[in-house]
Each structure stands twice: as C-alpha cells, then as structure tokens.
Swiss-Prot record:
SUPFAM superfamilies: S-adenosyl-L-methionine-dependent methyltransferases. Belongs to the class I-like SAM-binding methyltransferase superfamily. rRNA adenine N(6)-methyltransferase family. RsmA subfamily. It catalyses: adenosine(1518)/adenosine(1519) in 16S rRNA + 4 S-adenosyl-L-methionine = N(6)-dimethyladenosine(1518)/N(6)-dimethyladenosine(1519) in 16S rRNA + 4 S-adenosyl-L-homocysteine + 4 H(+). It comes from Corynebacterium jeikeium (strain K411). Its EC number is 2.1.1.182. The lineage of its organism: Bacteria, Bacillati, Actinomycetota, Actinomycetes, Mycobacteriales. S-adenosyl-L-methionine binds at residues 33, 35, 60, 81, 110, 133. The keyword Methyltransferase applies. This is Ribosomal RNA small subunit methyltransferase A. It comes from the Bacteria. It is found in: Cytoplasm. The keyword ATP-binding does not apply. Specifically dimethylates two adjacent adenosines (A1518 and A1519) in the loop of a conserved hairpin near the 3'-end of 16S rRNA in the 30S particle. May play a critical role in biogenesis of 30S subunits. Keywords: Cytoplasm, Methyltransferase, RNA-binding, rRNA processing, S-adenosyl-L-methionine, Transferase.
Length: 316
C-alpha cells in the first residue's frame, strides 16, 4: 500500500529548488503561496481524517506539498491545477519524492470550471473529500462551486485566509456572520479546525491562515428537515423535502445576498426588492415565522431555508 512506502515530504529547500527549476515567481493573481513545512501538511491531513479509503480532490496542488501528505496517508488523489507549468511538473516531483506508485492524477483546469465530466474523462473516481490549500483570492467561490458540483464530497478541510475562515464558521448574530457563513452552512456543519502561521509558506503571506472543516449533511438529515437540530418541521403538505433542491439552493443564496447587501437594514427593507415590495417581504417573513424587523445577521441558515421555502411555495 502507498502509505507503507516511504514518501518524502517537501521542506523549504525542496520548495525553493523546485521554484528555481520552473523559474517560478508566485503570483497574487493565482493566489500562490506554497507550504514548505511537513508538519503543517500532516496536520491538515489529520484534521481532514483522510484514510486509504478516501478519494480526495485537491485544488491548487502547487509544488506538491499537501499532495504528498495525502498520498502518505494512502488516499487516492485527483489534483486540479490551473497553472500548466505546475501541472506538468507535479507527476515528476511525486515520483522523485517516493510516490511513484501512488494513485494520483492531475486535471489541468480552472477549479471554477471543473465538473463531474472532467473526472469521468480522466478515468478518476468521484471525490469523497476536498482537502486543499485554496487560492486565497477565490477561496469562497471555489469552495461553494466544488460543494455544489460534487455531491459525492461528504467532507471538506480547506486552508484559507484567517479572516475568511472566521467568516465561514461564524455564528448568527456575530459581526462577521454573513453571506459566506450562510452559503457554506447550507451544505453542512462548518467549524474552525486550526490556525496556521504565515511562516510556513513561501512566499509568506501578510496574515495567518485558518483551517475550516465542513461535514456535509446527509440527504434528508439537514437541520431544516428535522434530522439533526430538532428544528420544527414543516407540515407534510408544505415540506421542504418536496421542493426542487436546485431551486431551493438558488433561492436561499439570493435571499442571503439581498439580506446582507446593506446589513444594517431590517429584513423587511433589505428584501423588499426581492419580493417586490416591503409589504410582500413582511408577509413572507411572517409566514416563515421570522420577525421582519430583524437584520439578516440574526438569521441562521436554517431560517434562510425556511424563508426560501415559503417564497417558493408562494409562486407555485
């Protein structure tokens, strides 16, 4: 098995050497910051509970630091890389570091465009886990795209800027709770896993990073379905489970965008454009059991889902 072989992880010297070979100058445009500390990538793999049974998708493998740690754990890895130089070099690096017989493949593509068909075309299994040091400039859009495009992903462990990690895992009522919190919470339970110092990267970013873990809700076991939180379910004839999942997601996301566009406004005012008038917004909010004088930052993802369901049922 792969995890019984001696795979050598990349340290600072190897990272610098690889960068020189590629004449690589990390760019802010692609959000490139490479981890050069073996303990950090092992920490990420451990926090993700990666085992030999996992099919992991890694976004932005870069020079291969995290890829090697995932392979060390025995996982099957499909790496999605947008930079053709890095994508071409990665297989050789893995072989040089002792992972020649590992189950790994590289898909050269923008992560925002990668789809299930790309995995089929490459003969790769659908991912069960997303583990990545996400490009910081597009971390949230990439995260949400992957969760939506790949329902097979039941577990996520990503490294993002610390403030982004805090926002993703923020609870309703906090000053940093917002659109990313609601949208990530639509897919699963979100929690901060760790803080990573900036000195483990090359080049070192200006701020620390955070690890965020998301465990996807099983179908039918979402809190708003009454499966986990003990939340009150809708009557059988009004059940959320009867609504089209894609329409529900889009409505939740649209409502969250509108509610936080001017976060100091009451929900009645903030959602007046979405519903056509302040009165219509108030009626929808009250139908969903939500006080229209509240602000968006007070609503949980579950309440946004209930409001979305009310909205969709009203236009059937």
């Amino acid at each position: 098995m792969v995890n019984e072989r001696k795979i050598r992880l990349l340290g600072p010297n190897e990272i610098r050497q690889l960068a020189e070979e590629l004449d690589l100058n990390p760019t802010k445009k692609l959000g490139q910051n490479f981890v050069h500390d073996p303990n950090t990538v092992r920490k990420i793999v451990k926090a993700a509970d990666v085992t030999a049974d996992d099919n992991v998708v890694e976004i932005g493998p870069g020079l291969g630091s995290l890829t090697l740690a995932l392979l060390e754990a025995g996982a099957s890895v499909t790496a999605v890389e947008i930079d053709p130089r890095l994508a071409a070099k990665l297989p050789a690096t893995l072989e040089e570091q002792g992972a020649a017989e590992a189950d790994v493949a590289v898909i050269l593509k923008d992560a925002m465009e990668v789809a299930v068909q790309d995995f089929a075309d490459a003969g790769r299994p659908l991912p069960t886990a997303l583990v990545a040091n996400l490009p910081y400039n597009v971390s949230v859009p990439v995260l949400l795209h992957m969760l939506e495009e790949f329902p097979s992903i039941d577990r996520v462990l990503v490294m993002v800027q610390l403030e982004v990690a805090d926002r993703l895992a923020a609870a309703p009522g906090s000053k940093i709770y917002g659109v990313p919190s609601v949208k990530a919470g639509f897919y699963g339970s979100v929690a901060r896993a760790a803080t990573i110092g900036k000195n483990v990267f090359w080049p070192a970013p200006k701020i620390d990073s955070g690890l965020v873990r998301i465990d996807r809700y099983a179908e039918g076991a979402e809190p708003w379905a009454g499966g986990q939180s003990g939340a009150e379910q809708f009557d059988a004839d009004q059940g959320i489970e009867q609504l089209d999942a894609q329409k529900l997601r889009r409505e939740v996301f649209d409502l969250a965008d509108a509610a936080f566009l001017q976060r100091r406004k009451t929900l009645r005012a903030a959602l007046s454009g979405h519903f056509g008038s302040g009165q219509a917004a108030e009626e929808a909010l009250r139908s969903a059991g939500i006080d229209p004088t509240l602000r968006g930052e007070k609503l949980s993802t579950e309440q946004f889902v209930q409001l979305a369901a009310t909205s969709l049922r009203s236009v059937r």
